[in-house]
Amino acid sequence: MAIKTVQDLINEGVQGRHVLVRADLNVPLSDGNITDPGRIDASVPTLKALLEAGARVVVSAHLGRPKGEFKEEFSLAPVAEALAERLDQWVPLATDVTGEDAHERANGLDDGDILLLENVRFDARETSKDETERTEFAAELAALTGDNGAFVSDGFGVVHRKQASVYDVAKKLPHYAGGLVEAELNVLRKVSEAPEKPYAVVLGGSKVSDKLGVIEALAPRVDNLIIGGGMCFTFLAAKGYEVGGSLLQEDMIDTCKDLLERFGDVIALPTDVVVAERFDKDADHRTVDLNSIPEGWMGLDIGPESVKAFAEVLSKSKTVFWNGPMGVFEFPAFAEGTRGVAQAIIDATAAGAFSVVGGGDSAAAVRTLGLNEEGFSHISTGGGASLEFLEGKELPGVSVLES
């Protein structure tokens, strides 16, 4: 069954109706300041469209992992301010999630007004494994929309989670996909169902175990699978290299051997790495080939020869999916691998390739390194969700919209 969209809701008539919007506003904070507002920016178009159509918008979202109790550092107060700036209107923040203050403020909304509920994860029922508890909380969220409410799911970064504000609440109200969720699904379908060949996937990040599902799902279908980041050292160990003090998942070595046996013709690994004597931004470091990693030193980035080889592969690709940095990009000395590969993807895109950055740390790296975001075809807001989609897993927050 086709999923109804926020545009369908607006066409049906939304003026004067309360609309609950689940957004993904889980942004990184430092001393109470937002360091990367990407997810807030991505949620604005859907909110604007509803407000301009005269809806009374109630926004639910989470921030961090407060474990079911109020914690000041996880309050959505900085997010309310950032939203107000972008929407050019006041965004009041309820002091609770579904309590007295939330109800009072929701009831007091006029057409075109917006309310942000406090962090949904301040209520332990949001993430409960007990369906009865989640259903009860979802009913309380739905009650904020009165008699003629609707639910818009626009937090793509959370659709892979079976949580009250994402999944259970959709069963309580007429439900629609927001513009962001709709756009994300369209892009991922394009990449997974009929990618233009040659198709290259670039995977980084620290653990093989985190990416195993996506490697298994994609390796048989791609032309090139480039592996960097901390996870490459378990693959290199599987090939017999001494990796020194680099990150190593010993229990995954046999799995990597098996993957290399089956997909060795498409898997590309680094040929040189940047090693450091300790994990520190100012650590003594040098570039070495794979046979020369000093004992006890740790690989924190891929080397320039690897970047060159990977860039060559990417320059011939027509579809590129990238998830996970090539090194510890937060430390300038170990950011060049990520920068080089990202730039190669931007260059491939300029030459006509369709490129997707799969959210999470990759999207953060693009912004941290000051790369041109417009240089990619699409930057996803959902790391985990985009990986699970490409693995072929059901996304609860999407499947519930189909019912």
UniProtKB/Swiss-Prot annotation:
MF annotations from Gene Ontology: ADP binding; ATP binding; phosphoglycerate kinase activity
Key words, A-Z: ATP-binding, Cytoplasm, Glycolysis, Kinase, Nucleotide-binding, Transferase
SUPFAM superfamilies named among the record's database cross-references: Phosphoglycerate kinase (SSF53748)
Pathway listed: Carbohydrate degradation; glycolysis; pyruvate from D-glyceraldehyde 3-phosphate: step 2/5
Protein species of origin: Corynebacterium jeikeium (strain K411)
Residues binding substrate: D24, L25, N26, R39, H62, L63, G64, R65, R121, R161
Residue numbers binding ATP: K211, G299, E330, G359, G360, D361, S362
A cellular component annotation (GO) from this entry: cytosol
Record localization: Cytoplasm
Quaternary context: Monomer.
Residues in coiled coil: none
Tagged with keyword Kinase: yes
Record family assignment: Belongs to the phosphoglycerate kinase family.
Name used for this protein in its record: Phosphoglycerate kinase
A Pfam family annotated for this UniProt entry: PGK
Reactions the enzyme catalyzes: (2R)-3-phosphoglycerate + ATP = (2R)-3-phospho-glyceroyl phosphate + ADP
Cited InterPro entries: Phosphoglycerate_kinase, Phosphoglycerate_kinase_CS, Phosphoglycerate_kinase_N, Phosphoglycerate_kinase_sf
